[in-house]
Amino acid sequence: MMRLLITTTVPETLETILKNQPRYLAGHFQVELATSPSESFSKVGHNEGLVVHRVPMMRGISVLNDLVSVVRMVRVLCRVRPALVHSYTPKAGLVTMLAAWLCRVPVRVHTFTGLIFPTEQGLRQKLLIWVDRLICACATHIVPEGLGVKKDLESFRITRKPLRVIGYGNIAGVNTAYFSAVAPGVAQSAAELRKRLGLGAEEFLFCFVGRLNKDKGLAELLQAFRALPTTAHLALIGDLDQTAPVDAATLAAIRSHPRVHALGFLGDIRSALGAADLLVLPSYREGFPNVLLEAGAMALPVIATDINGCNEVVEPGFNGWLVPPRDSPALEEAMRLAMQMPAPVRDQMCQHARARIQQRFERQQHWERMGAFYQGLLDSIKRIGE
């Protein structure tokens, strides 16, 4: 079997988002992994049953550390000698693609997820664009996570190479048997959570899942929420993110508002999604947010901003609403409409939400698409060699 090396900056990506995908691919290829050593490192090897190589990689810009990472990745590539290497996340992309180019790995694939440079300005934006152009120059194949990411790569002229979105986008898909309102224990845990929050049948629970930082649109969310009727409640699932902290007024509202429930990080978000009446994601930028797929699989309608990724999952009037980013009045209006929606219309939207995810983003389908994608690339090598 052909050798395949998959790399990520941190093992948490392999432990959560890409979980079990390498194991599936190992049924068709000889798969090994490379990522930074951290608390989750040993879990990845155990979960996937595969060899995991230690290559420390630092998030952010650090020229000396990045050069050390490239040297260590070169050593891994010289030992593994893969026919194909695939990197996810920005720093792993830079380190892996440069090292793989130096080692002349035949097929070098990088997947771009959420792009940072479109929302940056000045010198920082120029530096980020230069890094992404370098990644593309070293790669043989470039995979945008979704059509929005593809459009940004093209409009900023990051590369002239062909860009291919796998399936309908996203890097992992979602297990719709696991993320299901009728999965064992979900209904009970959801009911218990509503009871713990003091919610009756007449209360409407909005749910946000993600890092609590300013780029997630929390300021607009809290402003919109405060204008809603007193039957509205808001559950925030996720930890405070100090890399881009929310403003003081928003943080104070999160901590003091009697109908805002900050539940912190949850290892299993199904109880929160099951307890909620609607998911809201007012982000300023995204790549292809997994939480939209998870909520949809749980038959939960969504209010999201009209940005990359979100507008590839949410179809207004079908499975949710789209609002402009940074627009609190528009967000408030959508939240009011959701609360006022007649039960039959809501039930139909819930059905649409789950059906859309099952049809386009089922995890097993995505794995099969990835396997076919890799096989096509490796077959092209064989034809060239003949």
Region spans (language model):
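A conserved mid-protein helix/loop that constitutes part of the nucleotide-sugar donor-binding site
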Residues: E15-N20, F204-A227, P329
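Short hydrophobic beta-strand element within catalytic cores of glycosyltransferases
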Residues: L292, P301-A304, V314
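N-terminal strand-loop element at the rim of the active site
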Residues: I6-N65, D152-E154, P162-V165, L240
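Short, structured helix-loop element that forms part of the nucleotide-activated donor/catalytic region
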Residues: S42-H46, T230-R259, L263
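Conserved acidic donor-binding segment of nucleotide-sugar-dependent glycosyltransferases
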Residues: P316-G317, W321-S328, L337-A343
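Aromatic "clamp/platform" in nucleotide-sugar-dependent glycosyltransferases that forms part
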Residues: F265, Y284
